[in-house]
Amino acid sequence: MAKKIIGFIKLQIPAGKANPSPPVGPALGQRGLNIMEFCKAFNAQTQGMEPGLPVPVVITAFADKSFTFVMKSPPATVLIKKAAGITKGSPKPHTDKVGKITRAQAEEIAKAKNADLTAADLDAAVRTIAGSARSMGITVEGL
């Protein structure tokens, strides 16, 4: 018989930097989960990633105080800012442009995010990424 699920916890944690301090500790502690066990497992799985890159994770908590977790790809906005070489988007995205990315860069981001996007094909995924970039004040060349 399957274990009884008591809840899901969604967090964004920097790769390789999970520790018992907030937000990880309080979120897992409320459900009675082993915080250090999660931190060690998460840090081991994100070892090959760029340190500090925020990684969304969904933790499934079970009634017997065990858990499983699924990592998603980093947020598109973080990947877009990294590709454009900026630290934050424009406060007025439709009037003030703060950077630009090429279609090739948008395709690379779309391939990285493909598992998490609901796009039917790569071209639709690229258009989704381009829309996110435009809403941040970043122009997409070649689109």
Curated annotation (Swiss-Prot):
A Pfam family (short name) is: Ribosomal_L11
Q: Which UniProt keywords apply?
A: Methylation, Ribonucleoprotein, Ribosomal protein, RNA-binding, rRNA-binding
Task: Briefly state the modifications made to the protein after translation.
Answer: One or more lysine residues are methylated.
> What CDD domains would the database entry show?
Ribosomal_L11 (cd00349)
> From which domain of life does this come?
Bacteria
Name the Gene Ontology biological process terms. translation
Which PROSITE patterns does the UniProt record give?
RIBOSOMAL_L11
Extract the InterPro entries matched here. Ribosomal_uL11 (IPR000911), Ribosomal_uL11_bac-typ (IPR006519), Ribosomal_uL11_C (IPR020783), Ribosomal_uL11_C_sf (IPR036769), Ribosomal_uL11_CS (IPR020785), Ribosomal_uL11_N (IPR020784), Ribosomal_uL11_N_sf (IPR036796)
* Any one GO MF annotation of this record: structural constituent of ribosome
UniProt keyword annotation of Nucleus present? no
Q: Does the keyword Glycoprotein apply?
A: no
Q: What does this protein do?
A: Forms part of the ribosomal stalk which helps the ribosome interact with GTP-bound translation factors.
What is the annotated quaternary arrangement, including any partners?
Part of the ribosomal stalk of the 50S ribosomal subunit. Interacts with L10 and the large rRNA to form the base of the stalk. L10 forms an elongated spine to which L12 dimers bind in a sequential fashion forming a multimeric L10(L12)X complex.
* Protein name as catalogued: Large ribosomal subunit protein uL11
Which gene name does the record give?
rplK
